[in-house]
């Protein structure tokens, strides 16, 4: 039975009180940005969070757009173990798409809906310092072969000072997942990883990962089989059972690292479902999967 509007608001009140003045890091996936309507709904929700006293930080991806741009420029996208092989030209295309297109678009939408957005990359304030990933070694026909995946990086240090300054001034930071190494080279880093690292550095209350599925499902074909809560100790067994599989494995593992590093809880939700973030945060049942550790068990 559909809840009356006043009941929805009353149900949300204790959550709003609990989350007031807290930091939440929200990772918006590239798939969510394919649809203008979905993107607008997400940004409206994030601006609303700011207006009820929550301090949101956005980390965005852009994989589909980068691939599309590469194809238009006549360059084939290549991947190795899920990582985009990033040569010099691909790195420039990634920067063009992430910083010049997606980041700017999100900041603009925040302004349209009444918020104050400001865009960043890891270069700004040397926010994300990283290093290039090591050359990969694989067996091809029984022969060990080296694979250089290019300017794909891992973060080493997050300097959150500039983010704290912006949050205190009521800005909503929007971060492109591009880091910088000790020599000033740009590095392409997985956006889920960046979001988790930034959430840990900011001591965020929540890490929210927007995907194209409604959290973890015991049966991928049955939305009603959603697992609403997962203890960190359950993750390995869920991977063994195949419930956590494919691209969800690095997302969940990254979220687990963030929780172990001080983030209270992490949430995996379907960003393509209208207002899913508000429903996950402000209703008792939620609509996604919440990850928690021993320090912050569900009440």
Curated annotation (Swiss-Prot):
GO terms for cellular component: cytoplasm. Keywords: Amino-acid biosynthesis, Arginine biosynthesis, ATP-binding, Cytoplasm, Kinase, Nucleotide-binding, Transferase. It catalyses: N-acetyl-L-glutamate + ATP = N-acetyl-L-glutamyl 5-phosphate + ADP. It comes from Methanosarcina acetivorans (strain ATCC 35395 / DSM 2834 / JCM 12185 / C2A). It is found in: Cytoplasm. Substrate binds at residues 62-63, 84, 188. This is Acetylglutamate kinase. The gene is argB. Pathway: Amino-acid biosynthesis; L-arginine biosynthesis; N(2)-acetyl-L-ornithine from L-glutamate: step 2/4. GO terms for biological process: arginine biosynthetic process via ornithine; L-arginine biosynthetic process. GO terms for molecular function: acetylglutamate kinase activity; ATP binding.
């Amino acid at each position: 039975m559909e809840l009356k509007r006043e009941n929805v608001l009353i149900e949300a009140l204790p959550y709003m009180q609990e989350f007031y003045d807290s930091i939440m890091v929200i990772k918006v996936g590239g798939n969510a940005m394919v649809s203008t309507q979905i993107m607008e709904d997400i940004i409206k929700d994030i601006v609303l969070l700011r207006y009820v006293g929550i301090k949101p930080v956005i980390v965005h991806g852009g994989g589909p757009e980068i691939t599309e741009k590469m194809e238009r420029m006549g360059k084939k996208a290549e991947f190795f173990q899920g990582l985009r092989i990033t040569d010099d030209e691909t790195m420039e295309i990634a920067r063009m798409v992430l910083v010049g297109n997606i980041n700017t678009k999100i900041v603009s939408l925040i302004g349209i809906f009444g918020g104050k957005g400001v865009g960043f990359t890891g270069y700004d304030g040397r926010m994300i310092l990283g290093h290039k990933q090591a050359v990969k070694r694989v067996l091809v026909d029984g022969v060990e072969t080296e694979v250089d995946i290019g300017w794909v990086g891992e973060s080493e240090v997050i300097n959150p000072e500039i983010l704290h300054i912006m949050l205190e001034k009521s800005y909503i930071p929007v971060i492109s997942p591009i880091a910088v190494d000790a020599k000033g080279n740009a590095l392409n880093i997985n956006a889920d990883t960046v979001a988790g690292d930034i959430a840990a550095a900011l001591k965020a209350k929540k890490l929210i990962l927007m995907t194209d599925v409604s959290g973890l499902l015991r049966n991928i074909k049955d939305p009603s089989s959603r697992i609403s809560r997962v203890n960190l100790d359950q993750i390995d067994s869920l991977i063994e059972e195949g419930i956590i599989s494919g691209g969800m494995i690095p997302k969940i593992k990254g979220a687990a690292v963030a929780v172990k590093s001080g983030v209270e809880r992490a949430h995996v939700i379907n960003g393509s479902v209208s207002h899913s973030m508000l429903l996950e945060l402000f209703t008792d049942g939620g609509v996604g999967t919440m990850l928690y550790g021993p320090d912050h068990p569900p009440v």
